[in-house]
Amino acid sequence: VCSSDLMAKIWAENSYCKRRQVGALVVKDKMIISDGYNGTPSGFENLCEDANNVTQPYVLHAEANAITKLARSNNNSDGSTLYVTASPCIECSKLIIQSGIKRVVYGEKYRLEDGINLMKKAGIEVIYLGEKE
């Protein structure tokens, strides 16, 4: 396990979400240029789930938080690597493709693989760090 993957796991612990904590790091030229974890938008109360433990529809995924944070910085993600603790969904995969990220390393599979398949179709190198099949 590389240090960036381990750091993404530690970053996930910042999430206020109870059901699932996900962390993401964008690395370029061996430097972390952005980070994110799943949670509510800025200015919202840090409650990810409703009274029935269902995730609120406005909760942002870790990848989306990391990528949108880049949009407000002087960095760009062209040719970078995204380390994320869980497999990106289809919506985050579209953001990853459009942001110029060229490599995604993830540690936990999701029941749907449409996001992974879309990134591969777009020519992004996708690496799963879990058990070999």
Model-derived features: where do they sit?
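Zinc-dependent deaminase catalytic domain
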Residues: 1-133
